[in-house]
Amino acid sequence: INYVSKDVDGLHDFYVNILKMDSIAPQQFPRTDATSDSGYDGKIKFATEGSMQMHLAERDLDVAAKNGRHINPVERGHIAFRTDDIEGFKRHLRDHDIPFADYGTAFAAEWYQIFFHDPEGNIIEVHQQVA
């Protein structure tokens, strides 16, 4: 689950101290270096209760425009699912006329990510490990 905030440290402290989740070292999630026209360089912290991860990211309303995409995954947060066949899943979305934003590895060096909306406008990420 990805939540966004203007106060990532405060949000992380809430999940770690109040809900007693464990902090995950950011080194476990290598990031792609952001450039002036690609990627994301906002603050991110991570927490887990053992089977689910929280990715707590700094809100950035310009990410979609900067990356030339129509969906901004750090505008209001999203849920994520893992696949072993990202190309097959993209075909599946196309077959159902569901538009998606293909960010590739722009955000995470080891994860290929796409984002799309459910019927209510909630953002969904599907990703595949690439390294």
Label every PLM stretch briefly.
Residues L61-D62, D85, A106-F107:
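Short beta->alpha connector loops
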Residues P30-T35, D62-N67, D102:
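A short, acidic/glycine-rich surface segment
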Residues M54-E58:
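A short acidic-to-branched-hydrophobic micro-motif
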Residues I1-K6, G42-G50, K66-A131:
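Vicinal oxygen chelate
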